[in-house]
Amino acid sequence: MTRSVVTDVPPVAVGGAAGSLLRWGLGHVLPSGSVWHWSTLTVNVVGALLLGLLLEALTRPGVESRRTHTARLLLGTGLLGGFTTYSTFAQELWEQVRSGDTTQALAYAAVTLVAGLLAAAAGMALGTRLGHRASSHARGVVEGAQ
């Protein structure tokens, strides 16, 4: 194993475990068994929003620092990767189609995909805005110190 693999595995594993537990917990809190699988829809849309925000906040021009790299692995790949679930979404769609609810399956798929795209875009916009605010604040602090 290379050094980067050895150092990258722990943050992904810890984040993935935490994200999976959060998803599992939400599955017990939100209603289930309906045409709309609220827990899956919620985790995927919230996950898209947070991933858009996180990646926009972490992807500033320049070389990625070790701290940023670890944060991306822990929070993005690990936490949000474990929190969101494409496989459950696909299984729920297949069950709806197999039981004859094709129209509902298509509606559920469309709502999930559109809401996810909008959430990711909103997260990226928020990340950009927060990044500009942070850099403006940092410039003000530096200018005030001179």
Regions found by a protein language model. Give the residues of each.
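Membrane-interface helix-loop junctions in multi-pass transporters/channels
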Residues: 1-146
